[in-house]
A protein has these predicted regions:
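Conserved ATP/PPi-binding loop(s) of AMP-dependent carboxylate-activating enzymes
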Residues: 291-295, 306-338, 376
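AMP-binding/adenylate-forming catalytic core of the ANL superfamily
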Residues: 48, 321, 326-327, 343, ...
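Conserved pre-ATP/AMP-binding loop-to-beta segment of ANL
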Residues: 11-12, 106-123, 130, 135, ...
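Conserved AMP-binding A3 loop
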Residues: 23-26, 119-146
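Conserved AMP-binding/adenylation subdomain of ANL enzymes
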Residues: 142-159, 169-208, 293
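Conserved AMP-binding/adenylate-forming core of the ANL superfamily
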Residues: 12-41, 83, 136-139
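Conserved AMP-binding/adenylate-forming
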Residues: 22, 36-76, 163, 375
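Gly/Ser/Thr-rich phosphate-binding loop
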Residues: 206-211, 220-285, 297
Length: 457
């Protein structure tokens, strides 16, 4: 398989259409990438301040072709957070948008020592300027791209809507897989609540739509299932667990319309993807994550590290595969480190496996509290509240014997508290329910739990 970053320089197929309706062929994109790659020294460290635009895409691909190492960052990153990263990692170059488009700025810094296999740096999921980065190798990128193409059956006829952030592994995986197959990317920075988003989808006949759980909640409120989108063939969901009720609703609707609905599972530490639920199983298995992607393997381990083989037992989900990344970096010197994981990733997620070999995520290993001696899953509490009070959003955090629940409908605080105490059979003093205007989320739609934890008593 030719690496996706090595574009077909003789192809006049359309590679990219942006939200100004400007199209670039593979030939044109390859020329722009080659021109920039010639100016980049091999093994240079490059900060790519990106959005979903052809300019940002050129920077990303040029780095990979030149064997420079890009760190993908949101172009709207707060200046103080960017400065923190600049101080820690001291990159040689920044690729960023200026008054006349994207341009390369030489920072006159010597290149750090970097492992030969290091291809890409990306911030950990939910990170907001944290210096903790995931180190991804060329082999990681190739292996995960190949697996995703395999189970999604991506071909050159696809026209993928690329609206998830390019600095987020889910968004980046859409770009990688479709470029690898010579398909078309529809790049946009708008979202579902903006009218231009749906005009763009319809005008350019998008064949696939992807989103995180929060995206699908918004789509439900927008009555997405009533929209006329005749070109749409594939729906994908990753970035967290979808509510089983919404999973069931979307899967049933997709099956009725002849669409494919994929529930998927992944992490930055696994390049992007680890698991998926085949569309033909989606309607009958609400809340189920699925099976390992082609070339990967799952196992469950108990607290001692012993493998759990019995169906229905809970344990930590462990993934094995070529897409397991090299490890983390928290400082410049870490870029010289080699493979610290050796193809094994303890995900930190608790899961169970049924008799058919399908896995269900039940919560984060760190998202369980002891409340008056009882083990309480915070993810399960959130699910209970949202189902019983559908008009509110909910996030649960806290510490042992003190569960802090934040809801967006403050008028229901006492009702939620009483409901949780009764349903969980715990004294009401275990719960503190607070109204909040909006749940803080990052650009990828993931909840920023640390911001809420900082508000706790």
């Amino acid at each position: 398989m030719t690496p996706f970053w090595q574009l077909a320089a003789d192809s006049d197929a359309v590679a990219v259409i942006d939200e100004q309706n400007i199209a670039l062929t593979y030939r044109e994109l390859a020329q722009s990438v080659a021109a920039l790659a010639e100016t980049l020294p091999a093994r240079a460290l490059v900060f790519c301040l990106c959005d979903n635009s052809p300019g940002a895409l050129v920077g990303y691909l040029a780095c990979l072709n030149a064997r420079a190492v890009p760190l993908m960052l949101d172009k709207t990153i707060a200046p103080e957070l960017l400065q923190q990263l600049l101080d820690i990692y001291r990159p040689g170059f920044i690729w960023q948008q200026g008054a006349e488009g994207y341009a390369l700025e030489d920072l006159q810094q010597p290149a750090p020592e970097m492992d030969d296999s290091l291809a890409l740096l990306i911030a950990t999921s939910g990170s907001t300027g944290s210096p903790k980065l995931v180190r991804q190798s060329y082999q990681n990128l190739l292996a995960n791209t190949r697996s995703i193409i395999d189970y999604l059956d991506i071909d050159r006829h696809e026209r993928a809507l690329a609206w998830l952030p390019m600095n987020y592994v889910y968004g980046l995986s859409i770009i990688n897989t479709h470029l690898a197959q010579g398909a078309t990317l529809l790049l946009t920075n708008s979202g579902p609540v903006q009218p231009g988003f749906w005009r763009f989808v319809k005008q350019h006949a998008a064949t696939s739509l992807s989103g995180v759980p929060y995206s699908w909640e918004i789509l439900k409120k927008l009555r997405f299932t009533r929209m006329d989108l005749p070109s749409l063939k594939t729906l994908t969901q990753a970035g967290g667990k979808l509510r089983p009720e919404l999973h069931s609703e979307m899967a049933a609707w997709a099956a009725d319309k002849g669409l494919r609905f994929f529930v998927m599972y992944g992490a930055s530490e696994a390049t992007s993807r680890m698991g998926y639920l085949p569309p033909e199983l989606a309607a009958d298995h609400p809340g189920v994550m699925g099976r390992a992607i082609p070339g990967g393997r799952f196992a469950l381990e108990d607290e001692t590290g012993a493998e759990i083989t019995a169906a229905g037992e809970r344990g930590e989900l462990v993934y094995y595969g070529e897409n397991v990344t090299l490890g983390y970096a928290t400082c410049r010197a870490d870029l010289a480190k080699g493979d610290e994981r050796h193809g094994r990733l303890a995900t930190g997620d608790m899961a169970s496996r049924n008799e058919a070999g399908l896995y269900t995520i039940v919560g984060r290993k760190t998202r369980f509290l002891k409340v008056f001696g009882n083990r309480v899953g915070l993810d399960e509490l959130e699910h209970l509240v949202v189902n019983a009070f559908p008009s509110t959003e909910c996030v649960a955090v806290g510490r042992d014997d003190n569960v802090q629940v934040f809801i967006t409908d403050a008028h229901q605080a006492e009702a939620v508290k009483s409901y949780l105490a009764k349903t969980c059979q715990l004294h009401h003093s275990a719960f503190r329910v607070t109204g909040i205007e909006a749940i803080p989320k990052n650009p990828a739609g993931k909840t920023l739990y640390r911001q809420l934890e900082a508000l706790c008593d």
